[in-house]
Amino acid sequence: MWVCSTLWRVRTPARQWRGLLPASGCHGPAASSYSASAEPARVRALVYGHHGDPAKVVELKNLELAAVRGSDVRVKMLAAPINPSDINMIQGNYGFLPELPAVGGNEGVAQVVAVGSNVTGLKPGDWVIPANAGLGTWRTEAVFSEEALIQVPSDIPLQSAATLGVNPCTAYRMLMDFEQLQPGDSVIQNASNSGVGQAVIQIAAALGLRTINVVRDRPDIQKLSDRLKSLGAEHVITEEELRRPEMKNFFKDMPQPRLALNCVGGKSSTELLRQLARGGTMVTYGGMAKQPVVASVSLLIFKDLKLRGFWLSQWKKDHSPDQFKELILTLCDLIRRGQLTAPACSQVPLQDYQSALEASMKPFISSKQILTM
């Protein structure tokens, strides 16, 4: 299997209300493209004023757009997904929470409409994505600082650009940062049909890694298995199959995994640990089951397993903006080669946000909801 050498080389151990009026920090003279006396532009945004059930607390509102100053960039949002982290943030269950009221959405792609006089790295027509979480992407237009945005090539598919900044980055870093994997090594993961899971399958295949992909049983399990295998998955098994003694037969023809990726917790994480090779690592990046990770004492002692966690926001804090930009460009190269595609998506107009929010929280929904503006 062809292995992209660039992939192996990149191995490195605001508020959301910003840009809308009224808000503290909204400012005076417009950029040269705008008249300071012009009527403020009106934009639509999905706003929540308190934490709770997203389907109940999120509202579509008309808001005024702030003027563009020297270091600002006005953008038109093109598409923005609904991720689990977005839901958790609205519910009030996340690693950081924006000041309220806030605009929802941590990810998406936008097109630059105008720039301030001090902006040097962007121009109208460029595509951009958020540099960090918390920007508030569920809106039609916004004014952000130049440093809050990262340019991405406009020759990649819109859905790929809209879903580039969170899940593929998480997948790539987990594959690269915790074990020194080599082509032919194997990786096991749960929640394999999630956005991160699908990215793991594809990036692992590009790296020459073999994957064991665990999913919950469901009526259309064969259809799901076929789709994941079309992405590059070597094995797709259910949670029930993972618990069977026959699992040991997997490792007659492939090495035991040195890396396990856990997005579920509870019994599922315990079973992942059981499959790891001695000295292997399980990385937890989510907790869909809302149950603690349970690690067998004997596994920790006799197999010397390691338990780690990963949060992309923390990785960004620990690394420079240039390193994140390099990561984005590496993933864009994969997209251009056809080795990384967007997860299965359903595009939903912004005004139909209620149905999109409800669908994103239903079990066994493999299609990511993407809001289009």
Swiss-Prot record:
One Pfam family cited in the UniProt record for this chain: ADH_zinc_N
GO cellular component terms given for this protein: membrane; mitochondrial matrix; mitochondrion; nucleus
Source organism, top-level taxon: Eukaryota
Xref: InterPro entries: ADH-like_C, ADH-like_N, GroES-like_sf, Mito_Enoyl-ACP_Reductase, NAD(P)-bd_dom_sf, PKS_ER
Broad enzyme group: oxidoreductase
Keyword Metal-binding appears in the UniProt entry: no
Result of altering residue 232 to E: In DYTOABG; probably decreased protein abundance; partially functional in a Drosophila mecr mutant model
Residues recorded as bearing N6-acetyllysine in the entry: 61, 252, 267
Transit peptide, start-end: 1-53
Gene Ontology terms: biological process: ceramide biosynthetic process; fatty acid biosynthetic process; fatty acid metabolic process; intracellular iron ion homeostasis
Effect of residue 129 to M: Strongly increases activity with trans-oct-2-enoyl-CoA. No effect on activity with trans-tetradec-2-enoyl-CoA. Decreases activity with trans-hexadec-2-enoyl-CoA by 20%
Effect of residue 311 to A: Reduces catalytic activity by 98%. Strongly reduces affinity for trans-oct-2-enoyl-CoA
Entry-linked CDD domains: ETR (cd08290)
Expression by tissue: Highly expressed in skeletal and heart muscle. Expressed at lower level in placenta, liver, kidney and pancreas. Weakly or not expressed in lung.
Disease: Dystonia, childhood-onset, with optic atrophy and basal ganglia abnormalities: An autosomal recessive neurologic disorder characterized by childhood-onset dystonia, basal ganglia degeneration and optic atrophy with decreased visual acuity. Dystonia is defined by the presence of sustained involuntary muscle contraction, often leading to abnormal postures. DYTOABG severity is variable, and some patients lose independent ambulation.
Family: Belongs to the zinc-containing alcohol dehydrogenase family. Quinone oxidoreductase subfamily.
Quaternary assembly: Homodimer. Isoform 2 interacts with PPARA in the nucleus and increases its activity.
Record protein name field: Enoyl-[acyl-carrier-protein] reductase, mitochondrial
Organism: Homo sapiens (Human)
Lineage: Eukaryota, Metazoa, Chordata, Craniata, Vertebrata
